[in-house]
Amino acid sequence: VKSDVVLIAFLLSVASPFAAQAGTAMQTKGKAFPPPAFYSFCSRQPGLCSTAGGTKVVALRPQLSAQLNEINLSVNSRITEVSDRAVVGKNDDWRVPTVSGDCEDIAILKKLELMKRGWPASALLLTVASYHGEGHTVLTVRTNEGDLVLDNLTGAVRDWSSTPYNYFARQAQGNGRRWERIGAAKSVGTTATGI
């Protein structure tokens, strides 16, 4: 099964939709309020709330693209989406899932797995949006090819502006406890640092 996930991740990275088109970066436009359960999560897991670090934009190489795809697919296949109410008896409870969780839990696990592989916390931002009138959380990865979204609703890693969501806010780079409102998309340049 693991070899199948790696093969699929490699094939997706080669045929990656964000490799063929110009990517976009999220423009931020001031302070936003974080989701209510975010602060209690940060008190329990400060390392996963961090966005500290010097690398703000990762230079995306084929092996890193493959890692994004592999982790997105692997976590999506291992973790069953279930509401917080069903799992812990609360409407909103951010945590690292082991078997099941909702969208923010799944995004947190993806951030954890990328950080274990050496990805900088400063380029891995928890991001909130809406989809069909419901709140939704994804992981945004800042790269020189655009801000890419790892999402529990799809196996595809996509440029954020190519998703069906209305984005509200994301963690601020350099201060993970602060959140910023999301504005328009801006074409990306080529300035990035490796990991």
Residue spans of the language-model regions?
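Bacterial N-terminal signal peptides that target proteins for export
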Residues: V1-L7
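A structural boundary/capping signal
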Residues: A19-I195
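Bacterial N-terminal signal peptides
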Residues: L7-P17
